[in-house]
């Protein structure tokens, strides 16, 4: 994992992923146990002065790791839905998956298939 960034950015990313998870259920993300736990943990490890706090850095690292997990799961599900085998595909669909287009069949007067 690269540099952690700011705790606020990690916090916002976690909230965004919670919103994505709860969009399917229709429930507000603030009603979940995960949200309440994150709020409680971030408030408990908030530092008001510039002292070095190991617990805050550990919390930030764990939160960033959890954010990476949630984001990876969401992207995996999206890729799985897009590319999962749905039986036999047509030639046009297979070409479209890799970004190609089939040439158009010539038509008009005198053309016989």
Curated annotation (Swiss-Prot):
Region span, Disordered: 93-113
Coiled coil: none
UniProt keyword Mitochondrion, yes or no: yes
Keyword vocabulary terms for this entry: Mitochondrion
Biological process, per Gene Ontology: mitochondrial proton-transporting ATP synthase complex assembly
Disulfide bonds: none
One Pfam match: Complex1_LYR_2
Main location: mitochondrion
Cellular component terms per the entry's GO annotation: mitochondrion
Compartments it resides in: Mitochondrion
Quaternary organization: Interacts with ATPAF2.
Role, per record: Plays a role in the assembly/stability of the mitochondrial membrane ATP synthase (F(1)F(0) ATP synthase or Complex V).
Family to which the UniProt record says this protein belongs: Belongs to the FMC1 family.
The protein's name in its UniProt record: Protein FMC1 homolog
Organism whose genome encodes this protein: Bos taurus
């Amino acid at each position: 994992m690269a540099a952690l960034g700011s705790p606020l950015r990690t916090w916002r990313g976690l909230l965004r992923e919670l919103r994505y998870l709860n969009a399917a259920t229709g429930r507000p993300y603030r009603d979940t146990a995960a949200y309440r736990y994150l709020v409680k943990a971030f408030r408990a490890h908030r530092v008001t002065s510039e002292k070095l706090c190991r617990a805050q850095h550990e919390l930030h690292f764990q939160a960033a790791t959890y954010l990476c997990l949630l984001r990876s799961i969401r992207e995996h599900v999206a890729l799985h839905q897009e590319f999962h085998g749905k039986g036999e595909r047509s030639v046009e669909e297979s070409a479209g998956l890799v970004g190609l287009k089939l040439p158009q069949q010539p038509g008009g007067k005198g053309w016989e298939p």
